């Protein structure tokens, strides 16, 4: 029958979270599949210990090797869509409020980082990776450590998630792999980029050249092992969360506003609103909006892109008293309320 090709692979996902760490999402809830832009290579690499350095053997060679701990990691790469963004931000932030929009077929999902006073355990989900009829693996207890989103005027917007699992990587009994979801792409020309003081942001979309956003949970992977854990991670908690935002702006002839904002440490707000021309229904389009209501510049170096002069701007996102956080993401799509982060039972 020959060997397996990369393009034969499929991945089953779920919008739902596991009911508990160590309890997989049920097969009836593993019904989602998203278009990925790169092969999702599951890194299953147990920590090994051998006796190569042990004294007294009379030679330099190892005579035994044992698995001490299990570990899994996975990277998922997507074009930015309302479905890929909602899936990743749900498990990245761990908190969502969803509402139906005026009896339409559209739903608004507002994602914010969960309050660590309530829980520090990241929500976890399960995935199934099928590479052939003889290779179908369940990845259990997958927590999302980091999401990065990038966009330039020349390319589609991309979004990537970096996952960390318990180390469980076993055979799956999922009978049928799901079909890919049809989801409109959110491109660079779908982005409205607003920048300015809070509530007075100005559209700078025509000046924007590139955009890089990331949010990390600093997941405490090594701290998740226990004496009674038989080598598997038993929890995955938040460490010290960190967010970055960098973007490029063309330099105007009549203004040095970005340098002025750096030296004055002006409190600024950024709204990045990707709005698709494809509608969920007659009223509401697919969209992803990222709001950072309080930030300051940390650097505004000059750059030359081709023949055009601009700024490469680096920022420090900060806590906002009104939001009671530092970032909020709103996604509009056709996924009903009470779906994202619902417990699989």
Indicate where each model-derived feature is located.
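Signature of extracytoplasmic/envelope-associated structural regions
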Residues: 1-345
């Amino acid at each position: 029958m020959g060997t397996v090709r990369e393009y034969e692979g499929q991945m089953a996902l779920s919008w739902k979270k596991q009911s508990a760490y160590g309890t997989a999402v049920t097969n009836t809830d593993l019904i989602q599949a998203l278009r990925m832009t790169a092969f999702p290579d599951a890194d299953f690499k147990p920590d090994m210990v051998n006796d190569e350095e042990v004294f007294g053997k009379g030679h330099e060679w190892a005579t035994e090797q044992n698995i001490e701990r299990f570990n899994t990691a996975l990277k998922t790469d997507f074009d930015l869509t309302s479905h890929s963004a909602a899936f990743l931000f749900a498990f990245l932030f761990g908190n969502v409020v969803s509402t139906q929009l005026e009896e339409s077929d559209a739903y608004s999902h507002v994602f914010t980082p969960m309050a660590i006073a309530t829980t520090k355990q990241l929500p976890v989900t399960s995935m199934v990776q099928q590479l052939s009829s003889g290779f179908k693996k369940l990845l259990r207890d997958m927590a999302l450590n980091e999401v990065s989103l990038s966009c330039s005027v020349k390319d589609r917007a991309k979004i990537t998630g970096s996952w960390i699992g318990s180390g469980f990587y076993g055979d799956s009994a999922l009978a049928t792999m799901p079909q890919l979801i049809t989801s409109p792409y959110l491109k660079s020309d779908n982005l409205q980029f607003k920048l300015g003081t809070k509530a007075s942001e100005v559209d700078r979309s025509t000046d924007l050249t590139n955009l890089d956003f990331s949010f990390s949970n600093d997941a405490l992977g090594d701290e998740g092992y226990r004496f009674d854990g038989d080598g598997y991670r038993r929890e995955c908690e938040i460490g010290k969360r960190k967010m970055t935002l960098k973007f490029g702006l063309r330099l105007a002839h009549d203004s040095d506003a970005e340098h002025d904002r750096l030296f004055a440490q002006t409190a600024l707000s950024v709204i990045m609103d990707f709005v698709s021309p494809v509608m969920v229904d007659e009223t509401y389009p697919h969209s992803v909006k990222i709001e950072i209501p309080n930030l300051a510049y940390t650097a505004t170096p000059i750059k030359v892109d081709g023949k055009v002069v601009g700024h490469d701007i680096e920022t420090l996102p900060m806590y906002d008293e009104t939001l009671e956080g530092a970032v909020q993401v709103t996604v509009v799509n056709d996924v009903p309320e009470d779906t994202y982060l619902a417990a699989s039972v």
